[in-house]
Amino acid sequence: MNYWEPVDGEDPELATAADGTSVVVQERFPSARVVKSLNQLGYHELDEHHRPNGAPDRIAVGAAGDDRLAVREVMRLVDRLGFDPVDVGPLENGLALEPDGSPFAATYTADELSRLVAR
């Protein structure tokens, strides 16, 4: 999730989440299989930029999570939706996909996104 106070209401814990909002969600629901993905692009980009597998202009969507099986499942979904999935590692790495992260609201190839989140 991306925390937006005007939409989500005031939540100081989410507003100051040093490891990202999805880590807070995982802590609140410890038995959930939380994967942060499909949040770095807006709905219009998801609609406009999906491409078939192998297309040279296919863009990447990151997936972060501590449950590796759940991450793989989400990555398969991302691929079926028409994007190149990029495993960005544990859930705390999903912070890079949030509004202050450089991949947010930008289109990158899988290689470019991998390099951005590896920093």
Question: Where does each model-flagged region fall?
Answer:
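Active-site-lining helix/loop region of Rossmann-like oxidoreductase modules
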Residues: P56-R119
